[in-house]
């Protein structure tokens, strides 16, 4: 009997296990990345964790997530490509959220040509994120660009922080229903300020395909993340 079919099944399980392992690694480091606004009564404990052994930091992290009601995803909880972003290191997922926000602001971003602005941009999304933005912004989108000229966000990009942009990217992806509301990406919400307000210009903006385009092109834009799409 040929072993072809079982091999395919094993590969699928192995890939899903890798996604779950990435999520678990994030969970065990939650004390390092959960935004301070979520710490609540555990804030004194979290504040002391940097000086403790990894096992104790992991225990604190899991306690923090349980207190906050973070999900425990199953192997099939990563079926949607966007849900698999929860398996990336949280810092990388936040960079990607900023890329999504900056795509929305691509018209404004075209004026960011001085050295200081480019360095700030690289700090937000990294060198690979800058390359991804350049590639995506070069796609044929003249009608979108003209449309954006008439609905620039009221808060200028220069006044935004990294957290602000990650939150804008989160809201844009959520508006597009990119991931399951009860899925693994809920954990990433904890990396953003608890009381972040919904940006009215995002809520009122016309629908676009930027998020879907970004997700579809992730394997070519970020080859090191190809394991997410195995």
Please place each PLM-identified region on the residue numbering.
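General marker for long, soluble alpha-helical cores
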Residues: 1-230
């Amino acid at each position: 009997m040929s072993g072809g079919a079982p091999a395919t099944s094993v590969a699928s399980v192995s890939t899903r296990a890798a996604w779950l392992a990435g999520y678990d690694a994030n969970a065990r480091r939650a004390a390092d990345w959960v935004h301070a606004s979520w710490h609540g009564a555990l804030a004194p404990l979290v504040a002391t964790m940097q000086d403790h052994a990894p096992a104790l930091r992991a225990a604190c992290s899991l306690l923090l997530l349980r207190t906050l009601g973070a999900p425990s995803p199953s192997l099939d909880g990563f079926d949607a490509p966007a849900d698999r972003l929860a398996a990336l290191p949280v810092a990388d997922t936040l960079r990607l959220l900023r890329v999504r926000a900056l795509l929305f602001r691509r018209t404004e971003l075209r004026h960011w040509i001085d050295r200081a602005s480019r360095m700030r941009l690289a700090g937000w999304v990294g060198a690979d994120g800058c390359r991804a933005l350049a590639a995506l912004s070069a796609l044929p989108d003249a009608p979108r660009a003209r449309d954006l000229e008439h609905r620039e966000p009221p808060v200028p990009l220069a006044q935004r922080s990294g957290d602000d942009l990650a939150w804008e990217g989160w809201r844009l992806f959520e508006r597009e229903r990119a991931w399951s509301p009860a899925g693994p990406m809920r954990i990433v919400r904890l990396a953003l300020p608890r009381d972040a307000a919904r940006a009215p210009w995002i809520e009122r903006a016309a629908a676009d395909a930027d998020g879907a385009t970004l997700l579809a092109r992730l394997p070519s834009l970020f080859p090191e993340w190809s394991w997410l799409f195995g």
